[in-house]
Amino acid sequence: KASVLITLAVLGVMFVWTSAAELEERGSDQRDSPALIKSMAKVFQSEERECTKLLGGCTKDSECCPHLGCRKKWPYHCGWDGTFGK
């Protein structure tokens, strides 16, 4: 009986220990993620984009991103033009 109780106690301590380590790991990820999001936002803000009408309102293909073309019929939005590559 004593060895079973000791084994259960050791397993309980190990469970609590690993749970605490996981929580600490998750906490560090959560602390780091706002900084990562802010740095990514700066990258996207600093990048100039040629395409301005991705979600609608285009009148010509040049307003769309590469490999997208403006639809000729309503609803006017940028759609894939069937090409690949850079």
UniProtKB/Swiss-Prot annotation:
GO molecular function, one term: toxin activity
Gene Ontology annotations for the cellular component aspect, listed alphabetically: extracellular region
Bridged cysteine pairs (disulfide): 51-65, 58-70, 64-78
Subcellular location field: Secreted
Keyword list, A-Z: Amidation, Disulfide bond, Ion channel impairing toxin, Knottin, Neurotoxin, Potassium channel impairing toxin, Secreted, Signal, Toxin, Voltage-gated potassium channel impairing toxin, Voltage-gated sodium channel impairing toxin
Major place of residence: secreted
Residues modified as Phenylalanine amide: 84
Propeptide segments, given as residue ranges: 21-49
Taxonomy, superkingdom: Eukaryota
Tissues showing expression: Expressed by the venom gland.
InterPro entries (UniProt xref): Huwentoxin-1
Leader peptide range in chain numbering: 1-20
Family stated for the protein in its record: Belongs to the neurotoxin 10 (Hwtx-1) family. 47 subfamily.
Domain notes: The presence of a 'disulfide through disulfide knot' structurally defines this protein as a knottin.
Its job: Inhibits TTX-sensitive and TTX-insensitive sodium currents (IC(50) is 0.6 uM and 0.95 uM respectively) on rat dorsal root ganglion (DRG) neurons. Inhibits muscular subtypes sodium channels Nav1.4/SCN4A and Nav1.5/SCN5A transiently transfected in to HEK293 cells (IC(50) is 5.42 uM and 0.45 uM respectively). Also blocks Kv2.1/KCNB1 potassium channels expressed in X.laevis oocytes with an IC(50) of 604 nM. Injection of the toxin in mice was immediately followed by general ataxia, lack of response to stimuli and semiparalysis.
Protein's recorded name: U18-theraphotoxin-Cg1a
Organism in which the protein naturally occurs: Chilobrachys guangxiensis (Chinese earth tiger tarantula)
